[in-house]
Amino acid sequence: NTLRYLLTKNAADRDVSIIEGVMGYYDGMGLTTTHASSYEVSKVTDSPVVLVVSAKGASLSVLATIQGFLTFCPDSNIRGVILNQISPMTYTALAKEIESRFGICAYGYLPKMTDCTLESRHLGLVTAAEVENLREKLQVMAAQAEKSIDLNGLLKLAESVNPVSY
């Protein structure tokens, strides 16, 4: 109930709310439970999930990874994917396979962008104050996202969701 309350309160007068997941999608408070995982948050809030999958150095294995997420818990709420660190050509081929095999949407991709790398450490990203040229990096990433991610499709997915009530 606390989660639903906080989302309802903070989403008031907003068109779209984005809930960012933590760690692995099914990783919860313990090693063998989904309690407090991003999966559980999606269930409690009845939110559709767009999984961001690293495709670095892979092709068909990306499909196996996605299939694993979809079948691990059949009620996963996963409605689509965005592939990260992938070439446009490979994305085009994999997107067709993702949509035909799994019936979920491939919303786009981000290519490898070495000039825009955001460092991380054990428990997450470094703080904004620690990132050199952050504003410029974000502008470059935003411009790329506008080119290679179906932002209208993501908005359409968001519009299909019933508002969370408390």
Residue ranges and their predicted role:
Residues 49-52, 107-109:
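Short hydrophobic alpha-helical runs that function as membrane-insertion/retention elements
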Residues 60-166:
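Internal gly/pro-rich beta-alpha loop/helix module
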